[in-house]
């Protein structure tokens, strides 16, 4: 400190005076700050009190606000309920208003109805009084009628008693006359038995003739099939030659005739037929006919039959059932080839045609008929052969007409014509048929029905009995089968007398009329009465259960 230019005493004095001032200033500042701190503490305490008071007020205000909000929500919900209630009340008011209007209207209607009912009630009362008066009058008249009719019944009872007494006496007289006639009946039965034995002998001879003629017909069918096959071959050769000469033949036919024909198919079909058809084997009847099942149908001819019909009552009783049977078996009058190809549209025969049917008067056919190398002398019908195809079954029907109208129908006075020409069509089932007439009228709901016949076929009673009592024997193929090479034929030809092949016409039927005389008439009279009862028994005695017919 000695080295300094100032003296230390002076510095010490100056520093002491300055520090005092600083201390004083500091004390003053401390006092000032203390006063300010005290004032601030007081103001802070006051503000703290005010803050607490304000916080309490704020809390009370928040509680009031929450209460106000809750109250507002409650009031809003109440207001909404009141509004909905008001709407419901308005709807109810509208409904009640409409109901009130409807009730007012219904009340008016009920008043009007009440007035009407009152007037009706008055009218009904008056009507009741009137009906009561009329009812009393009716009761009185009814009592009078009752007394009158009671008296009439008493009179009728007395008359009926008298009638019974008279009839009793008459029946007693008839009984005595019947007892007296018993001896005559026994004598007649003995004579009828003898006649039946004679008829059975005639039937045996006739059946033998039938078998012979069936063999002849089988041979004729074979010859006819071979002839048909040769004709098909010739036609096929002609068509092939025409196609070679005119390649556009099919187009020309279509242009000129307006018909579309497939010649290629026809040629192929014809070749198949010629390849598959053969007539070298013989016809054999395998099974015997069912005589009992075919008896009723053979005694009843429904489609142009050539058999006379003298027992109309028995035949007409089964007409409905036989017609339905005929519809079910529409193929029985034709030869059915099961394995033949289908028929073509040009009616070219593809297999064996049906054999011509045998006339039922076979016993009266002359021996010139049995020659196989000559065709029948009766002219054929102009109706073309019919070809139908059902499930590859080929069916051909030959129809022969027997137009010998001028034969000896009246050569013998002991014979009567039993079936005459009748070309009308019957449109209905009639209970009666006429036998002895010539009529070409169409019947529409008439009470009588003529027996349809083949064209102009007239027979006598002798031929009629020969046919009707042996129809089952003529149909030898009724339930059997006829076997040929290349085809199988179901021989259900139960309607051989239906007019499709009656080649043995009236000429042969009536030429035999003079040969029988009175015996024929007696035989026909006997058979007309007992035909339907004895046919099955007689025919069953003439055939064995199984036999074969070999050509």
Swiss-Prot record:
Lineage start: Eukaryota, Fungi, Dikarya, Ascomycota, Saccharomycotina
Cited function: RNA-binding protein that binds specific mRNAs including the ASH1 mRNA, coding for a repressor of the HO endonuclease. Part of the mRNA localization machinery that restricts accumulation of certain proteins to the bud and in the daughter cell. Required for the delivery of cortical endoplasmic reticulum into the emerging bud.
Protein name in UniProt: SWI5-dependent HO expression protein 3
A single GO BP: endoplasmic reticulum inheritance
Stretch list, region Disordered: 1-22, 285-551
Keyword Membrane: yes
Family that this chain belongs to: Belongs to the SHE3 family.
Keywords: Coiled coil, Endoplasmic reticulum, Membrane, mRNA transport, RNA-binding, Transport
